Amino acid sequence: MNKKIIILIYLIFIKSIVGQNPVWIGGSGCNLFTDSSCWSPSTSPLTTDIVTMGVDSTQTVVDGDITITTLINNNLTLGGVEMSSTISLEIIDTSLIVSGAFSMATNSRLSLSLSDSYANSLVSGSATRNAVNVLMNLQSMQTLMVGSSFTMTGNSVLDVNRSISTINGVFTMNDDTSLFMYSKQNGDSKFTVGNSVLNDASSLNFQGQSFIFFNQTNLPSGLVLNDQSKIVAIDADNVKISGVVTLNDQSSIQLTSSRLYLDSLVTATTSSILVNNSTLSILQSIPTTFSPASAVFKGSVFTIKSNCTIQSPITMIDSVYSFNQSHTLASQFTGSNVYMIMDAAILNAGNYYDCSGCSLSMRNSIANFDSYENQGDLILSSSKLNSNAPITSNTGSIFGYYGELNQALTVESGSLGVYNEKTRLFVNGNVIVESGAKIQFYLSSPLDFSWLNTSGSLDVQSGTIIEIYVYIEILNNGSMEVIKTSNGFVTPLSTDNVKLYTYDPDNDVITDFSTTGGCEYSISITNTSVLVHTDYACQQAIITLGTDGISKGSLAGISVSMVALACFVSLGVWWKTSKKNDQRNDSQVLTNFSQNKSDDIDVERKL
């Protein structure tokens, strides 16, 4: 039979130290400040008393509910709290200040919350109580303040709903204890502790927006998960955990339709990570080793901001993998329909990269593979891809502004370049474009246009079309060398496989220039080059086949080494995302959270 004691008080913070003998509280229908049957040995606890909740004046265990809510001029500051038996304590719209330790026994429950009506009033202004001016807003409201340690045992539960609480000491969860953090409206749940340890099968559970802050004044600090303990987030929109999160033993992180942002993550080789339709971001640039027994991402985003060595298998399906700085794969990476984003990064993949239908987008970056086969989009913006074997592309496109491939390239299907993006690509070797594939170049002006420069030959096989798209509003005359080869063309080019189009990007209209009757644009094909000319004083279309290449053209003065150096030069424009309509920007990657968060460029895209 549940018995309920309503404790109506309002709390202010005062400095106190733990002392006196234990005091007990229990019974039902009591006014704690007048009825001696509720307290033993006195009718009111001192600020230094250690209070045991869940027993009556004879120290007999009493199951029941205790509710602490606001009342002017009644204040409760205690030296310590021990919740025994199956007692349930609710702290609503006020603060409980404990200078010493707080412990929860088996099956006890502590709920910290602000009511909807009170939360709304807190947002609106300020008030004065007990001659203390309190800024009545959600950021200053302390629901629970514990000066020493907080320990949970048995099956005890801590509910934090739109609460702002602080534990200055160690927060320990044992057995099957659970912490639930969630927020319905008008603010986040915030929980600040010195450091935290989870043991046995205890769990942190998140829903809505929550923030746990671990004070790093005394290292080591942060969140330590032992045994089979876990972090669980379900439909948690914006969960932030500061400090170092350490997964020991068989502990785990389990995310479903949630976003979890960590400062730093340390993983044992027996831990596990499961991310489903969620985001997991590691924000600090501290070098790290990622080594859980398993890590699976489905329909999710995984972001790492630091130098990282991947020493455990990773499986990604329909997901985004984004990283900065240096990444080394020392274990198998298996993916399907993965969009990998490198921003000022170096990837050492070796022979551990196995990704089907995957895209790689690089900005100011270098990627090193034993072998590489493109099965999606390969976007090289001031970036270089190195392979120990010739590179193949059997689907999608290869494009980007100032990209370099260190090996010969075979395009089996898809396209080299795209009609609506400028592509400038160096290939150190021969280029083969097989039947059915395309070469596409976008020419926006004689000073800024696409080109292919290969140190070998270009083999455009039967059925392959070179499509050149000229921006419809080019107004100045000039020549543009769109293809430059050192060893010429394996199969002579002609107007049968080199086509000229005009392109109106504003309306996305493409017109075959051969059908317009115009002569503003013309093509020259030599033994080693393909050039496009503009002439607004023309009388007729000019298509010429020559025998001599040009020794100095629009590519003169551009060094292959520029691409490698460009990995350390920031460009003002990155790649566009219009080519992947199934992805969307998510620019909510944590503001005002950690020192590095302002650099956290939007990388989330929902596939």
Swiss-Prot record:
The residue spans the entry assigns to the Cytoplasmic side of the membrane are as follows 576-607
Q: Which UniProt keywords apply?
A: Glycoprotein, Membrane, Secreted, Signal, Transmembrane, Transmembrane helix
Segments on the Extracellular side according to the record's topology features: 20-554
- Leader sequence range is 1-19
The answer on whether this UniProt entry bears the keyword Iron reads: no
Positions bearing carbohydrate: N75, N161, N215, N276, N277, N307, N324, N453, N477, N527
- Gene Ontology biological process terms in this record: sorocarp development
Fill in the subunit field for this protein. Answer: Forms a complex with psiF/dicA.
The role this protein plays is: Component of a complex that acts as a quorum sensing protein regulating discoidin gene expression during growth and development. Its function in the complex is unclear as it has no ability to induce discoidin during growth and development by itself.
Question: In its UniProt entry, what is this protein called?
Answer: Discoidin-inducing complex subunit B
> Source species, please?
Dictyostelium discoideum
